[in-house]
Amino acid sequence: MAIYLQVRVASVHLMLDALHVHEILSLDAVLSGANDHAQWRDDVISTVNLARQFGLPDHNTTMGVIYSTATDSRPVMLMLDEVLGLKDLKETEWRAFPRIPSASAQFFDRVWLEEAVQRQSFRLRHPLQNDLLGLPSVANEP
């Protein structure tokens, strides 16, 4: 079993590996900087607007999830609309991803079907290369 943080950006539901989530913030409390950066604790980190990243209609997001895209990578702030909570899932609960364009498939590897609410949640790959999110690559990344 593994624990995932279920989030929403626009109409898309995502699952983030909870072991790599550092913090969840309201964007009202975040000091935004220039060039897609924000202050977090005593550091300046990159931000990624997931709506923009996935080609969804651009809008004001309300939540930020501080997340490490790879085990040894610097955290980034994923900007999204809603945090739905933690889900404890067995590997057998994940379904193979349907055929989708490779531009989208590089972000996701499995899908969880929530039949009770007629919802699909896409599991964000981990590790995920920073350059896929428009972030600079670093030497210790895979």
Label the predicted regions.
Residues M1-P142:
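An acidic, low-aromatic, low-complexity terminal/linker signal
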